[in-house]
């Protein structure tokens, strides 16, 4: 899914200026990367707030329109208000199509309900890490990674090497020879 966001350069900075922006339905943000100086921007709160609720937005390649120019960006960070449903600030990183990007991708458990551990041993699969840091070209960044648990039994520990990575995607930890545990399987051993 592709996302398009309109942004404008903001001149006024600081706490007071940021509060005024938020009252006007805007979010203060920053755009950095691509060897350029960071640019203070403002984006529409409603557009970003509802997009952030979608898991795919966090790893998607976003088209950011700024001063009539469109840039490919990814969400690098964002801050939420402690108790209101409100985005306080957002950081975008400009990316080039031919340069690798390091990003955290969500991890999903699949086929756990069909495994011996769950069906016969009354167990369950628990994630130790909800996301995996990967290295990929912007066009190859997956929305999520699947951890297939069809063959697991109680007592198993699943590692990064058990995740099938799509073509053109590498695990940062596996490149450093760190095969970290990502999930455990609990239940009665038979």
From Swiss-Prot:
GO molecular function: 5S rRNA binding; structural constituent of ribosome
Keyword Membrane applies: no
Keyword Ion transport attached: no
GO CC annotations, alphabetized: cytosolic large ribosomal subunit
GO biological process, one term: translation
Keywords for this protein: Ribonucleoprotein, Ribosomal protein, RNA-binding, rRNA-binding
Superkingdom of the organism of origin: Bacteria
Family (UniProt): Belongs to the bacterial ribosomal protein bL25 family. CTC subfamily.
Main function: This is one of the proteins that binds to the 5S RNA in the ribosome where it forms part of the central protuberance.
Assembly: Part of the 50S ribosomal subunit; part of the 5S rRNA/L5/L18/L25 subcomplex. Contacts the 5S rRNA. Binds to the 5S rRNA independently of L5 and L18.
Protein name (database record): Large ribosomal subunit protein bL25
Organism: Neisseria gonorrhoeae (strain ATCC 700825 / FA 1090)
């Amino acid at each position: 899914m592709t996302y398009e966001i309109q942004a404008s350069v903001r001149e006024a900075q600081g706490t007071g200026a940021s509060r005024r922006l938020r009252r006007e339905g805007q979010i203060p943000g920053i755009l950095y990367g691509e060897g350029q100086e960071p640019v203070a921007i403002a984006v529409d709160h409603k557009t970003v707030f509802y997009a952030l609720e979608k898991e795919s937005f966090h790893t998607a390649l976003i088209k950011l329109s700024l001063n009539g120019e469109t840039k490919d960006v990814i969400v690098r960070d964002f801050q939420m208000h402690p108790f209101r449903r409100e985005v306080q600030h957002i950081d975008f990183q400009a990316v080039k199509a031919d340069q690798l990007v390091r990003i955290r991708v969500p991890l999903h458990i699949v086929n756990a309900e069909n495994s011996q551990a769950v069906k016969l041993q009354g167990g369950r699969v628990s994630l130790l890490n909800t996301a995996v840091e990967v290295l990929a070209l912007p066009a190859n960044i997956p929305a999520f990674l699947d951890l297939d648990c069809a063959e697991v039994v109680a007592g198993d520990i699943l590692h990064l090497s058990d995740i099938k990575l799509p073509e053109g995607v590498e695990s940062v930890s596996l490149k450093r020879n760190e095969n970290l545990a990502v999930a455990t399987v609990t239940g009665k051993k038979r």
